[in-house]
Curated annotation (Swiss-Prot):
<feature type="domain" description="GH16">
    <location>
        <begin position="26"/>
        <end position="216"/>
    </location>
</feature>
<keyword id="KW-0964">Secreted</keyword>
<keyword id="KW-0732">Signal</keyword>
<keyword id="KW-1015">Disulfide bond</keyword>
<feature type="active site" description="Nucleophile">
    <location>
        <position position="102"/>
    </location>
</feature>
<feature type="binding site">
    <location>
        <position position="200"/>
    </location>
    <ligand>
        <name>xyloglucan</name>
    </ligand>
</feature>
<comment type="similarity">
    <text>Belongs to the glycosyl hydrolase 16 family. XTH group 2 subfamily.</text>
</comment>
<feature type="binding site">
    <location>
        <begin position="195"/>
        <end position="196"/>
    </location>
    <ligand>
        <name>xyloglucan</name>
    </ligand>
</feature>
<keyword id="KW-0052">Apoplast</keyword>
<feature type="binding site">
    <location>
        <position position="275"/>
    </location>
    <ligand>
        <name>xyloglucan</name>
    </ligand>
</feature>
<dbReference type="InterPro" id="IPR013320">
    <property type="entry name" value="ConA-like_dom_sf"/>
</dbReference>
<comment type="function">
    <text>Catalyzes xyloglucan endohydrolysis (XEH) and/or endotransglycosylation (XET). Cleaves and religates xyloglucan polymers, an essential constituent of the primary cell wall, and thereby participates in cell wall construction of growing tissues. Has a high XET activity, but little or no XEH activity in vitro. Acceptor preferences are XXXGol &gt; XLLGol = XLFGol &gt; XXLGol &gt; XXFGol.</text>
</comment>
<dbReference type="InterPro" id="IPR008263">
    <property type="entry name" value="GH16_AS"/>
</dbReference>
<keyword id="KW-0325">Glycoprotein</keyword>
<dbReference type="InterPro" id="IPR016455">
    <property type="entry name" value="XTH"/>
</dbReference>
<feature type="active site" description="Proton donor">
    <location>
        <position position="106"/>
    </location>
</feature>
<feature type="glycosylation site" description="N-linked (GlcNAc...) asparagine">
    <location>
        <position position="110"/>
    </location>
</feature>
Amino acid sequence: MGPSSSLTTIVATVLLVTLFGSAYASNFFDEFDLTWGDHRGKIFNGGNMLSLSLDQVSGSGFKSKKEYLFGRIDMQLKLVAGNSAGTVTAYYLSSQGATHDEIDFEFLGNETGKPYVLHTNVFAQGKGDREQQFYLWFDPTKNFHTYSIVWRPQHIIFLVDNLPIRVFNNAEKLGVPFPKSQPMRIYSSLWNADDWATRGGLVKTDWSKAPFTAYYRGFNAAACTASSGCDPKFKSSFGDGKLQVATELNAYGRRRLRWVQKYFMIYNYCSDLKRFPRGFPPECKKSRV
């Protein structure tokens, strides 16, 4: 295969994933409830946009009406602009209770001109402590960008603009719990965490810049729900059809994953010797792609 045909294959792959992730945007009125923050959360533009705001009194949040058990979840976000130090925008899947499962994106704000930190984590049966953190290769406050979670029985894939940044593989054979039996809702919140979010809490929230606002659009869930079974779009992605690339990593996807982790990962619990002086958690052996 020559260079031109290789490039064509790569472009086609990216296009297929992009189409799968964005062609079925849903209405926020139909899919979500604003759960806290009084009127600081808003759904507008006919249900095509949602915003969360934070001031010195309160933050705000929302959750999905449906519970999901496996699927691909896409959301476009534009994060708090300017001096966002001390703020956290969280976007995640979670069940409830002491033994809950959870799949996290958390965006840790920073001082003007300094990069956001994207914090990821996976909880299974109430246990987390599986953090990986990244800088982004763009300014997430200037435009909307797509943040996706692919949740399958075999693995969880975190994607940013359809580029994989993290894979958490099922390592139950090694005795590691994996989220696979508890349906989860989608949650998001914007809140003050200046006791830890920016430089370990050294930089506090500048309330003179409030209200802080994050924006959402382009939600899509090609998924299985606890109440009505599997979306046909997600079912087709399990088969041999052209959409399989949307829930699996091909060779190009694995190369892009390695690129992100080489140049933009700033913390990986699987390489933290101070935290695990007696050996890394067993799932770390399966974390390489």
